[in-house]
Each structure stands twice: as C-alpha cells, then as structure tokens.
Design a protein with these regions (language model features):
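Helix-coil boundary/capping segments in enzymes
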Residues: 1-106
C-alpha cells in the first residue's frame, strides 16, 4: 500500500518564511503539545533529511498546498510548482484560493 502525506512542507523557497520554519520555538512547542517530537528535517531545514524521513516512513508522495495566510505565512503557487517540477516523482501540488480574493484566482 502506498502512503501519501497530504500536508508536507518541504524546507524550500518561500515555505522557509512560514511560521513552521521562521518561528522554530513555536513549531517545536506546538509539536510537543501534540505528543510528538519535531522532525529533524524541520529543525535543520534539510531537504535531504525530509526525503529520508519520508522514505523511512514509507511515504511515496507528498502533497504541497499553496496558501495565502498573513499569520502563518503564505506559500505561493509559483513555489509549489517549482518544487513539484524539481521533485516530480515525490511531490504533487494543490492550488490554494483565498476566499475573499476568489475572483482574482479565476
């Protein structure tokens, strides 16, 4: 059975500006509140470690979603596309639409 991670945030491009990477203490505190330890790939902002963690966990594909978020940090469609193009056998992208700006997305 193939495992797909539907919420992966690789440490690349603008994703590094999101709260997950830019505010490591917040990320680590939140992760521990959920009873888990922060992923070494997130702590070290390491793409090779992320790929190893995915492989070790049996994850065959990761889904990256674009989003517009002032509080948590935005992930652009261009960044999602570039990451998926660089790792076509690993990542799949999903567009994100900001509901107040939905007409601009058409």
């Amino acid at each position: 059975m193939k495992i797909i991670d539907f919420r992966v945030r690789p440490p690349l491009k603008g994703i590094l500006k999101t709260a997950m990477y830019a505010n490591a203490p917040r990320r680590d505190r939140f992760t521990r509140q959920l009873g888990m330890e922060p992923a070494p790939s997130a702590q070290k902002k390491s793409m090779p470690l992320l790929l190893k963690e995915m492989k070790d966990a049996g994850v065959s594909r990761g889904v990256i979603m674009a989003r517009l978020s002032d509080m948590l940090g935005s992930i652009s469609h261009q960044d999602v596309q570039a990451i998926c193009k660089a790792y076509p056998k690993i990542f799949v992208g999903i567009a994100g639409v900001d509901p107040p700006s939905r007409r601009a997305a058409l």
